[in-house]
Amino acid sequence: MSVNRYTITNLSDYSNPKVVKKLLYSLDKLYHAAMWKGDGDSLAIYVDLKSAMHAKGVLTEKQMVYLKMWLDGYTQAEIGAKYKVGRDNISYRIDNAVKNMSLFLGN
């Protein structure tokens, strides 16, 4: 996903978990746009997402670990193999992490 002002404006509905997941997947691009291009909107979204990830009570420890690995580029199957759980379990926990973040940010 290309990060530009149009994309940011249309993807700033935090109450929608699908939007939050797309933004999380673009976290590095948001950081790059904020730091190297001076995009204040990207910076605000980056800070919001990072704050939600680290806010007490938003994510469980497993959700945090799996989400970070997914954001680092590991597939759900690779994460599952590392922790000896099924890919469906990883998918479930990542999706719930995104929903929790969406609820936190959407309020």
Question: Where are the predicted features?
Answer:
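Hydrophobic positions on the alpha-helical face of helix-turn-helix-like DNA-binding modules
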Residues: 66, 78-81, 90
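Short amphipathic alpha helix immediately N-terminal
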Residues: 56-74
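Intrinsically disordered, low-complexity basic tails/linkers immediately adjacent to helix-turn-helix/homeobox/MYB/SANT
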Residues: 14-17, 21, 99-107
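DNA-recognition helix of helix-turn-helix
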Residues: 83-106
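Amphipathic alpha-helical segment used for protein-protein interaction
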Residues: 33-61
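Charged, low-cysteine interdomain linkers and short loop/connector segments
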Residues: 1-43
